[in-house]
Amino acid sequence: GVDREVCAVGGPCTSYELVFHDQTEVAFCGRDTASLRLFKETLSTSYYHISLTHDVIGLESAVALKNAYALAVAMTIGLVNRHHGADAGLHYNSQAGAFYQAVKEMRRLLKIQQATEDCENIGIGDLYVTVYGGRTRRIGILLGEGKSYSEAMDILAGVTLESLVVARRVAKAIYRKAELGQVSLQDFPMLV
């Protein structure tokens, strides 16, 4: 057989939309250009578009970070439900404000890791799709509505929620970097 390696696939893509052939842009990352090109040639379609990057750490970090920040943005949806009722119609200001702050913080974190700008953009696109169509949206809304962590976890029993693990781990890392004088906690209000 042929030995090929792709380190990660990331970007704004939900499987159910891919099944319907919705236009989708993702990135494949790895160190071997020939392997990446082969995968792109093999898997690209008229609706599944693939960018390539050698920035493995940047891409993997971007797609992980989006989970933590999507949780925070989704919580604003729950807050609106709690204060105005679930049938109050669409409220975008708080979501947009939280999304803006999430993008700023993600960019700062990715710069610390020397991620490429392309990986930043992939992470931002992934943040968008996760806020509006992912599992993280569900837990964020429940927490924003005032459910306790335990209540929300009971409601979503059996659902994998990377966002909670990522948020805790990234916050812990930021606190440590702040102790070392490498970052200011004021730059990361959504995490601290």
Q: What annotation goes with each model-predicted range?
A:
Residues G1-Y92:
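Rossmann-fold dinucleotide-binding core
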